[in-house]
Design a protein with these regions (language model features):
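Hydrophobic faces of well-ordered beta-strands that scaffold small-molecule active sites
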Residues: 16-20, 45-47, 93-97, 122-124, ...
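Glycine-rich phosphate-binding active-site loops on the catalytic face of alpha/beta enzymes
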Residues: 44-53, 119-123, 128-131, 171-180, ...
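N-terminal amphipathic alpha-helix/helix-capping segment at the start of soluble metabolic enzymes
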Residues: 1-20, 86
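C-terminal helical cap(s) of enzyme catalytic domains, especially alpha/beta-barrels
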Residues: 57-65, 229-252
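Catalytic beta/alpha-barrel core
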Residues: 70-72, 118-131, 145-153, 158-159, ...
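Glycine/Thr-rich beta-alpha phosphate-binding loop at enzyme active sites
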Residues: 61, 71, 158-197, 239
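Active-site beta->alpha loop and helix N-cap motifs at the rims of alpha/beta catalytic domains
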Residues: 44-45, 49-51, 60-125, 245
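Catalytic cores of alpha/beta
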Residues: 27-37, 153-163, 205, 209-225
Length: 252
């Protein structure tokens, strides 16, 4: 469990969470952005590790991930960068990474590198439930949260899915991949109520949140709001100051 993530939810009335693809549009851009994270309205940041088959990601994020991979960005590239600049970053960083990458890397070695790079949580979209208990136990020993993903279609599996989770619950507010249209508000409200019945963890809503109006609407229902696709879209300009400005407008 990551105390730093828990503390953010205790301190903030509503938590702003963003997402970037590591190494896109360049490793230097990622470095500069992370070193200026304190100048953004974000309270924590998901860092996506480039992967060739990102099943949860829409076209835009998949394309950014593909371009980063093509440019030679690997899991080790990201670890090296974050370990180098970890003292410059005061806000919690969370990896969004696919299980195949962790498995190929070696689970214990991967967790060891996460701790060294000061990673506070992991979101693993393709983690098999059967592997979640062991993964969660190993992460807890290293004060890293395993953040569970639940969707509006999870139904009576929600309790089972969140049972191994820490930090917060990532509630998927759309029926598709990242960037998809959200489900209607009554269904969303009912979905979050179902989550709260089975867990005391804070709930953050993601997928389909594209603009400031969306952000402010979702704040009425959830403890945190997650924006990915729009932020990755900003990074295509390859301008750190522009990206920060647009993020601050998004979360104002």
């Amino acid at each position: 469990m990551s105390k730093k993530i828990i503390d953010v939810f205790k301190e903030k009335e509503k938590v702003n969470i963003g997402y970037i693809v590591a190494g896109f549009p360049s490793v230097d851009f990622t470095k500069q952005f992370l070193q200026n994270l304190d100048n953004t309205a974000l309270d924590m940041l998901e860092v996506g590790i480039p992967y060739s088959d990102p099943l949860a990601d829409g076209k835009l994020i998949s394309h950014a991930s593909f371009l980063a991979s093509e440019a030679g960005v690997t899991t080790d590239t990201v670890f090296d960068l974050l370990t180098e600049i970890k003292d410059d970053i005061s806000k919690p960083l969370i990896f969004l990474i696919y299980y195949n990458l962790i498995f190929a890397y070696g689970i214990d070695e991967f967790i060891k590198k996460c701790k060294k790079a000061n990673i506070k949580g992991l979101i693993i979209p393709d983690l098999p439930y059967e592997e979640a208990f062991e993964m969660s136990e190993k992460l807890r020993k290293n004060e890293i949260a395993l953040i569970p993903l639940v969707s509006v279609t999870s139904g009576n599996r929600i309790k089972k899915i969140v049972s191994q989770g820490d930090g917060f619950i990532y509630a998927i507010g759309s029926l598709g991949v990242t960037g998809s249209k959200q489900v209607d508000l009554p269904r969303l409200e009912s979905f979050i109520k179902e989550i709260r019945k089975v867990s005391n963890l804070p709930v953050s809503l993601g997928f389909g949140i594209k603009n400031n109006d969306n952000v402010n609407t979702m704040r009425k229902y959830a403890d945190g709001v997650i924006v990915g696709t729009s932020i990755v879209d900003f990074t295509f300009k390859n301008d750190v100051n522009y990206t920060i400005q647009k993020i601050n407008e998004l979360f104002k």
